[in-house]
UniProtKB/Swiss-Prot annotation:
Transmembrane segments: none annotated. One of its GO terms (molecular function) is iron ion binding. 2-oxoglutarate binds at residue 165. Keywords: Dioxygenase, Iron, Metal-binding, Oxidoreductase, Vitamin C. It comes from the Bacteria. Residues 80-174 form the Fe2OG dioxygenase domain. This is PKHD-type hydroxylase Syncc9902_2001. The keyword Oxidoreductase applies.
Amino acid sequence: MDFLTSELLGVEETLQLTSELTNRESIWLDGRLTAGEHAALVKHNRQLDPSLPLARSIAEIVEQKIIDSPLLKSFALIRRVHSILISRSEVGDGYGWHVDNPFSKHGRRDLSFTLFLSDLSDYEGGELTFQLLQGSKEIRLPAGQIILYPSSSLHCVQPISSGVRLVCVGWIESYIQSTEDRSLLFNLDAGAKGLLARHGRSDELDLIFQAYANAVRRLSGR
């Protein structure tokens, strides 16, 4: 499994985060300031000034929510969450096909995430679109939902045709760099935990958890 979607914020939590982002034009900067040289050519949006206390506060809340999620921790095997940004896209804005830079000054980018902050009824367009071997995959999620995906993915954000799209984006450095290895470990962990919940602990299940822990050690180089 390369992609994962999950609810990260409830309705009230999402409204609380976004309440201070509306009707304040001075807090937004040109989104191209945080893009690489090639990606900047196709990036058209605005981003919350990262130097503002508001931006740092939102980033801290989102980071902690991700770290506290058992599902996201199991899927991403999180070493650190970093480079969190708030993006605002209006009519005509979008982000053409690109691949995220592999590194930032804060760490390696193994997984990217988009946390949707706007209700689906607030805008049209703005689909997060991935180029896959079998074709393209479009994602539009309700407010409070997050998607994690490999940072190596070729993806784009379709132009906004009406309304305003607010999202929080960021990156995860994983203990396990390989997407395939993370997928293997996630399936093993999910299966073992499912058996534990259904049947309780057993000596055989202890061996599976031991194998999982030692596989993480080996694949992480630790």
